[in-house]
Amino acid sequence: MKIDILTLFPEMFAPLEHSIVGKAKEKGLLDIHYHNFRDYAEKARHVDDEPYGGGQGMLLRAQPIFDTIEQIEAKKPRIILLDPAGKPFTQAYAEELALEEELIFICGHYEGYDERIKTLVTDEISLGDFVLTGGELAAMTIVDATVRLIPQVLGKESSHQDDSFSSGLLEYPQYTRPYDYRGMTVPDVLMSGHHERIRLWRLEESLRKTYLRRPDLLERYDFSEEERKLLDKIKEALG
């Protein structure tokens, strides 16, 4: 996968050189480049200006963004604008982006964008109902969530399949050594070696956690008969 990021602050992306994203680069599975679009700005390197019609703040000008993207060698990229008014980013969205060969991210600052910039983009993405100082943190989040889904990036292909949201449910509780820590013990079922009992326990705990913390996810979840019965059992036990 090739990723190009348009930003005024390339140095903010240093953390991406480490961990999973860094390993993807080392394996030759990811090629990532940062472009300071101030370098392409005309008018004394100014990238922002006052909005026509008046109003608060400054807007990102179209010219630096257009010129930066036009010099990027890309065949058919997904061009992503980070915007609080965009489509909410989800695990399913990350899975979709992980199938692409080329992604371009536009990280804004200031009050907003000249609307004409949006004629370039294929996706407008938001991390949620809040506003950040710039798009860099959002871009890093999306890149991390997406790159880890590229085949061969993680040690095992199944490593991400049990993640929260990958199945549509929150992930079940997990434990490691020691068995007893300060009086808190590992559930006996996980020590039993009985694979079917462990599977059922994990499924029930995933359903319980999702029901208690994110019931909205269950509204669009496609239940199996087994899952429906387990959820009914959970609801009855909780009263």
UniProtKB/Swiss-Prot annotation:
A Pfam family annotated for this UniProt entry: tRNA_m1G_MT
Catalysed transformations (reactions): guanosine(37) in tRNA + S-adenosyl-L-methionine = N(1)-methylguanosine(37) in tRNA + S-adenosyl-L-homocysteine + H(+)
Keyword entries, A-Z: Cytoplasm, Methyltransferase, S-adenosyl-L-methionine, Transferase, tRNA processing
Binding site residues for S-adenosyl-L-methionine: 108, 127-132
CDD domains the record matches: TrmD-like (cd18080)
Record-linked InterPro entries: Alpha/beta_knot_MTases (IPR029028), tRNA_m1G_MeTrfase_C_sf (IPR023148), tRNA_m1G_MeTrfase_TrmD (IPR002649), tRNA_m1G_MTases_N (IPR029026), tRNA_MeTrfase_TRMD/TRM10 (IPR016009)
Entry EC no(s): 2.1.1.228
Location(s), subcellular: Cytoplasm
A GO term, aspect molecular function: tRNA (guanine(37)-N1)-methyltransferase activity
Chief place where the protein resides: cytoplasm
GO cellular-component term (any): cytosol
Gene Ontology biological process terms, A to Z: tRNA N1-guanine methylation
PANTHER family according to UniProt: TRNA (GUANINE-N(1)-)-METHYLTRANSFERASE
Function text: Specifically methylates guanosine-37 in various tRNAs.
Subunit structure: Homodimer.
HAMAP family: TrmD
Protein name as annotated: tRNA (guanine-N(1)-)-methyltransferase
Organism: Streptococcus pyogenes serotype M4 (strain MGAS10750)
Chain's gene name: trmD
